[in-house]
Structures are given as structure tokens and as C-alpha cells.
Amino acid sequence: MLMFLTHFAEHVTPFNVFRYITFRTGGAMITSALIVFLFGPTIINSLRVRQGKGQPIRADGPQTHFKKAGTPTMGGLMIMTGILASCLLWANLASVYVWVVLMVSVGFGAIGFYDDYLKVTKQSDKGFSGKARLGIEFLIAAIAAFTIMRAGQEPFSSSLTFPFVKQLVINLSWFFILFAAFVMVGAGNAVNLTDGLDGLAIVPVMVAAASFGFIAYLSGNAIFADYLQIHFVPGTGELAVVLGAVIGAGLGFLWFNAPPAAIFMGDTGSLALGGMLGTVAVATKHEIVLAIIGGLFVMEALSVIIQVGFFKMTGRRVFLMAPIHHHFEKKGWTESQVVIRFWIVAIILAMIGLSTLKLR
């Protein structure tokens, strides 16, 4: 919205500042943080009254989790409110990439909201049907992938690039839609599985958002992209503004989610944020780098896949409990130890992922 003011920059020179992505990214970050800080208490109180018993606690989970009973969920509403309001104010609304990323985020968030609603009303961890949920997610993701492919420059719009290698590019043609949809849905559900402890998911999400904000800015700049030998994708630099809003909203949410949490993110937030990260990775042609930067999310998802698959084949478990953060709790780590150590892992993986921009 503020980009409109640049039309008057010839007469009001200070309006030129809104042309700069870096300035608007900072503005988006501050705005979303303030929105969550200011409206957070009201939203939390409203959810606490409406939800009554709050998010149900797993009966087979660590004993320390039972003291969290009664904590409201759907905290993703706070996060998404901050992100959407901030993006409407600071982002260039003429960018197709901004709208695609927000569409996936809102769509996935709506699925998560319905899932949270069912869990709270039924007081059960059995929410939305898994198959139906995945089906709708893939539909949303496929539409987004098609839009991204059509918006890009041929032949690179449907190609897959690899980190650490300059010239290795594979044109997936129409299979790109299936691959991209898998990345978006996988990212959404991986973040969802990570969100099991106070503050565990939101900090790695912010770390990944900061990393991909940097990548988006470089990918959308012809000079930087040429220097780093990465694909130049015109228009993706605007996604840095969106991810700046994510960081700000994440900081605001962490204020209330810090242990002992006053509210949980819920599927509403985790699916929305994960889907957003996956979509940004697809738009910037850094899908594989997402698996590195978001390696913590991959680890959490793989632990569940391995646990379920191994149990079905042998009747035994690999981990004491999945996702893997619960395994470490069962091993005797305190919740704060698990959370902070996983944050450290997320930061290290982000640095490794960003190093792929130069190590080619």
C-alpha cells in the first residue's frame, strides 16, 4: 500500500524511501511485531474463554506436559494477523509472488484452524482426517506451483537447481508442479510436527525466514544473482518484505509463547508458516537449500516417518517417542534443554544453508 506513495516521489522526495526493499522489510518487521504485541493479550483472553479446556494434552506424552492443560491454542491467528496487516501496508501488492505466498499461508492456516477447532471441541488429538487434510493441502500447493511456474522465465521456471554446483539444472517440465507441491506440503507438515514444546517451532521458523529473506533479496537482484551464480528470479526480492513480517510476528508471538506458554501456536500457525517457507523456497528456486536451512524440521518429520514405518513392519519403536523432541524428553532432557539445543541446531543449519550461495 505504501508503495503507492512512490508515484508522488517526484514532488515529495522522502517518498522515494518506499522503493527500497530493505527499508520496507524493516518496516514490515516492526509493524507485525507491534500488532502482535498490542492485540496479543486480547486474542489470548478471547481464545481462553471460547476454548475452555484449551488444547488437549497427549495421554502418552511426558508427565511434565500435563501442567499445560488449559492453555489455549490457535495462536497462529495472532501471527497471521500481524503478517497479513503488515504485508498489506509494506509489500508491493502488484507482485504475484507476494499473493501466491500469502494464498498458500492463509489456505494452510485455514486447514490448521479447522483441525485445531476439532481437537478443542472434541478434546481429542484426533482432528481433521489426515487424507482429506493432505488432499486439500496438495490442491492449494498445486495451484500455487502452477502460478509460480507461469510467472517465471522459461525455461528456468520449471527447473530444479542444486546447491554447491553452478551449472547443474534439471528441467522438470510439468512434473515441477508435483515436486513443488510436495515441497510446500512437506514444509507445512514438518513445521507442524516440530511445534510440540514452548518456543520450539517459532524460533527456527524465524531463523529460516531470515535466511530465505536474504536469499529472496539476492535472487531478485540481477547484479547479486549474477555475482553468486544463482538463478535471477525477477520479483522475488519482494518476498523479503513478507518474511520480514514473519520475523516480527514471530518475535511478538514468542513473547507470549515463552515458557510457561500463555498460548500455543497450534496447527493454525505451524501449517501456515511452514507452507509459506516452502512456497518461498519454490519461488526462489532454492527448494533443496530449504532442506538444509530447515533441517531441524526435516529431522522432526523423518523421526515420525521412521517411527511409524518401523512399528508397522516390526511392532517395535526406534525412538522412545516421536517426534524426536519428545524422545529427548523421555531420555531425561528438560524441556528448556531440548528447545534451546534445537534452536542452536537450527542456527547452525541455517549458516550451512546460506554458505551454499557462495560455495559453488
Swiss-Prot record:
GO CC annotation terms, alphabetical:
plasma membrane
Q: Pathway, per Swiss-Prot/TrEMBL?
A: Cell wall biogenesis; peptidoglycan biosynthesis
Assigned EC number? 2.7.8.13
| An annotated Gene Ontology molecular function | metal ion binding
The protein's required cofactors: Mg(2+)
Known catalytic reactions:
UDP-N-acetyl-alpha-D-muramoyl-L-alanyl-gamma-D-glutamyl-meso-2,6-diaminopimeloyl-D-alanyl-D-alanine + di-trans,octa-cis-undecaprenyl phosphate = di-trans,octa-cis-undecaprenyl diphospho-N-acetyl-alpha-D-muramoyl-L-alanyl-D-glutamyl-meso-2,6-diaminopimeloyl-D-alanyl-D-alanine + UMP
Bilayer-crossing residues are 27-47, 71-91, 93-113, 128-148, 168-188, 199-219, 239-259, 262-282, 288-308, 337-357
| GO term, biological process aspect, one | cell division
Predominant location = membrane
Query: Where does this one sit in the cell?
Result: Cell inner membrane
Q: Which domain of life is it from?
A: Bacteria
Going by the UniProt record, its keywords in alphabetical order are: Cell cycle, Cell division, Cell inner membrane, Cell membrane, Cell shape, Cell wall biogenesis/degradation, Magnesium, Membrane, Metal-binding, Peptidoglycan synthesis, Transferase, Transmembrane, Transmembrane helix
PROSITE patterns in alphabetical order: MRAY_1, MRAY_2
Recorded hits in Pfam families, A to Z, give: Glycos_transf_4, MraY_sig1
Membrane topology type: Multi-pass membrane protein
The text of the family note is: Belongs to the glycosyltransferase 4 family. MraY subfamily.
Q: What does this protein do?
A: Catalyzes the initial step of the lipid cycle reactions in the biosynthesis of the cell wall peptidoglycan: transfers peptidoglycan precursor phospho-MurNAc-pentapeptide from UDP-MurNAc-pentapeptide onto the lipid carrier undecaprenyl phosphate, yielding undecaprenyl-pyrophosphoryl-MurNAc-pentapeptide, known as lipid I.
Name the chain's protein. Phospho-N-acetylmuramoyl-pentapeptide-transferase
Q: Which organism is it from?
A: Brucella ovis (strain ATCC 25840 / 63/290 / NCTC 10512)
